[in-house]
């Protein structure tokens, strides 16, 4: 009999317990049932319950009449080196012993450099043989224990340790339960056992300029691409040209003297039909909206501005002059929710109308932030927010987000899709932190950015009024320094997806030069170094330990496992434990860490998988994800001697704990857990 003694303060969300024989999994097959393990069930060319990659010229996946028993088997064939697989998810009882059996046949299988064809059980620790050459039907069998796992993915592979070629058949796969341990769960309270105090910074959050996290999420602006990065009517633009069959007949882009950015749209009005419009605006019941349009015309011109939904229309009449001016607009509240309102700008006289920029916000916004989203953010009570990225920061120039908001240049998002309007920069982020009573944590651009840019950013935030950057900050409306404490030197610079990514050796030098320059500006700031378990960490910690206070680590979990609830949930605490254990090893093995307490800043952690229904990477979360986040927070408690800060990534929409559409906002299942903690 296995006993699990659990300290009360660290009790997990899920306790391993015995599973009655009559109780079966909530989804999928019965315990130990591999559906269609003999490949006999087919519909047209589809082998039921098995998944294979999309069809390609390199490798073929099909059922074949060659069988060990019955009339069909799974087959993979490749003339050249390739990777092929058939996958099937199987539910297994936790704390049980199983026997796996499967039959394999090979014909001219060649592997380079190693491996071959064979079975793999993803989710449990077991070694299975590889096959090469030509072999008749051969039985593969192994016994294994599930532990706390409750699922496995069975993979039939051509190319187990690399690529392979040839032909391979798989048939008659099965699992047999050899026994299940009875788990006695007990709670033990030991007041004499004390761990390191848990840091309040464990409950931090992370927001990045991507998808609908900032724009379409936290920020209240209702108009997308309000500064016209894309020419209206062009692919990618939310703006449309009405009144003409071809956009170029009704509009051109003025690049000679743009109001902001690289060009400004000019409507060529015939006085009757031409209009610029944006659809799919959301309106909440009882909340009016206001904004403005910056315009000029080549002659005095009457312009109608309309907000309409179905047969309901509100119309404003403006008289536009020949120099740029900001024209205010206001629309009364609708008495019901509207998800597809249309905003239109309609010149009423023949001539040309320049539209420099436009803005529209609900009247309940708080300093530009959505009131409903802000209320949910406050409910999280997060002590620290990391900003602005993420991958985004490696291509971000913080100067773009400073100064008059309408004049800040729009940019293509350097790391993700969409347009960066630069409406939310340092001043707006700092105001958000004030509204949430939270601490700011700023990542500097150590990708494409330089040392001076980072040092100037520190001075802009923390310098006195007599410094060059402090003077500029005062000119932009903030005389008093913000005294930002937390700063990171870059983001994930170890990855080839990162703008400006480089070798560990090169980044060691770059980190140290950034740290020296940033500390020269303000020696009181706390610096966080880019980390990644393995050689990167070892090099950074060995060569930069004197120039950091914390080291960053990231992890995300998917649903690539066999589908079991416990397996899904336990991914989070297992990853936290894995990273913490690695850093304990570093402390033992790296001389530069002697006498230092460089703890982990887990500034990105979460589940990250589909379905993405809230914009770019806007994951929908389920109860199983909430349980995993709760288990993760409990694990942070257990690892409190190694983890100082953690930032759930990301807060709104993009893999976020808060979901917001144009009309509504609420906590995701993960948000409900974070709020409780």
Where are these regions (language model features)?
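Conserved, mostly hydrophobic/aromatic
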Residues: 205, 293, 381, 433, ...
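Extracellular and organelle-lumenal recognition/adhesion modules and their flexible linkers in secreted
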Residues: 18-422, 439, 449, 455, ...
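The substrate-binding groove and active-site-proximal loops of carbohydrate-active enzymes
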Residues: 359-367, 408-422, 439-448, 490-508, ...
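Aromatic/acidic polysaccharide-binding cleft in carbohydrate-active enzymes
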Residues: 209-210, 595-677
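Noncatalytic carbohydrate-binding groove/subsite architecture in carbohydrate-active enzymes
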Residues: 341-347, 351-352, 471, 503-633
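Structural recognition of the beta-strand scaffold that forms the well-ordered cores
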Residues: 203-207, 383-388, 440-443, 485-489, ...
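Bacterial Sec-dependent N-terminal signal peptides
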Residues: 1-24
């Amino acid at each position: 009999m296995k006993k699990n003694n659990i300290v009360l303060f660290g009790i997990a969300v899920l306790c391993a317990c015995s599973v009655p024989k009559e109780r079966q999994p909530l989804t999928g097959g019965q315990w130990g049932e591999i559906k269609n393990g003999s490949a006999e069930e087919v519909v047209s060319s589809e082998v039921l319950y098995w998944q294979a990659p999309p069809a390609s010229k390199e490798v073929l996946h099909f059922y074949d009449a060659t069988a060990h028993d019955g009339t069909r088997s799974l087959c993979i064939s490749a003339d050249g080196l390739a990777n092929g697989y058939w996958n099937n998810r199987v539910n297994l009882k936790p704390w049980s012993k199983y026997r796996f059996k499967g039959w394999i046949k090979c014909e001219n299988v060649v592997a380079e450099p190693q491996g071959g064809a064979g079975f793999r059980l993803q989710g449990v620790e077991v070694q299975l043989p590889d096959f090469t050459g030509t072999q008749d039907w051969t039985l593969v069998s192994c016994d294994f224990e599930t532990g706390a796992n409750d699922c496995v993915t069975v993979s039939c592979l051509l190319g187990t340790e690399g690529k392979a070629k040839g032909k391979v058949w798989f048939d008659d796969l099965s699992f047999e339960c050899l026994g299940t341990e009875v788990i006695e769960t007990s709670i033990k309270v030991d007041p004499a056992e004390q761990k390191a105090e848990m840091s309040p910074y464990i409950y931090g959050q992370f927001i990045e300029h991507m998808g609908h996290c900032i724009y379409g999420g936290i920020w209240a602006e209702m108009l997308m691409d309000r500064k016209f990065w894309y020419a209206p009517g062009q692919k990618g633009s939310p703006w449309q040209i009405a009144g003409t069959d071809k956009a170029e007949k009704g509009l051109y882009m003025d690049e000679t003297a743009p109001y902001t950015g690289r060009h400004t749209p000019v409507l060529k009005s015939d006085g009757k039909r031409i209009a610029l419009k944006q659809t799919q605006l959301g309106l909440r019941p009882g909340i009016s909206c206001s904004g403005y349009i910056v315009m000029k015309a080549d002659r005095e011109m009457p312009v109608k501005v309309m907000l309409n939904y179905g047969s309901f229309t509100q119309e404003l009449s403006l008289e536009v002059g020949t120099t740029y001016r900001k024209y205010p607009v206001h629309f009364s509240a609708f008495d019901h929710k509207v998800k597809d309102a249309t905003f239109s700008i309609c010149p009423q006289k023949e001539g040309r109308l320049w539209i420099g920029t436009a803005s529209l916000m609900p009247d309940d916004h708080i300093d530009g932030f959505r009131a409903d989203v802000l209320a949910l953010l406050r409910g999280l009570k997060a002590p620290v927010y990391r900003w602005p990225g993420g991958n985004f920061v490696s291509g971000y120039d913080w100067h773009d987000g400073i100064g008059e908001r309408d004049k800040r240049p729009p940019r293509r998002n350097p790391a993700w899709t969409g347009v960066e309007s630069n409406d939310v920069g340092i001043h707006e982020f700092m105001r958000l932190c004030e509204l949430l009573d939270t601490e700011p944590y700023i990542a500097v651009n150590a990708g494409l950015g330089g040392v001076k840019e980072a040092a100037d950013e520190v001075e802009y935030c923390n310098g006195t009024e007599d410094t060059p950057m402090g003077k500029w900050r005062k000119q932009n409306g903030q005389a008093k320094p913000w005294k930002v404490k937390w700063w990171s030197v870059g983001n994930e610079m170890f990855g080839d997806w990162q703008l400006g990514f480089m070798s560990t050796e090169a980044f060691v030098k770059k980190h140290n030069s950034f740290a020296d320059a940033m500390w020269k500006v303000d020696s009181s700031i706390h610096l966080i170094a880019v980390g990644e378990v393995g050689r990167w960490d070892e090099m950074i910690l060995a060569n930069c330990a004197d120039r950091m206070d914390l080291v960053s680590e990231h992890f995300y979990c998917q649903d690539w496992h066999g589908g079991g609830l416990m397996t899904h949930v336990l991914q989070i605490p297992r990853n936290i434990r894995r990273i913490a254990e690695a850093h304990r090893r570093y402390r033992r093995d790296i001389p530069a860490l002697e006498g230092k307490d460089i703890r982990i800043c887990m500034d990105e952690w979460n589940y990250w998988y589909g379905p993405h229904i809230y914009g770019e990477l806007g994951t929908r979360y389920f109860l199983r994800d909430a349980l995993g986040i709760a288990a993760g927070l409990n694990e942070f408690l257990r690892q409190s001697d190694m983890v100082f800060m953690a930032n759930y990534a990301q807060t709104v929409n993009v893999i976020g704990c808060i979901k917001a559409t144009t009309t509504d906002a609420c906590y995701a299942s993960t948000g409900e857990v974070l709020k409780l903690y």
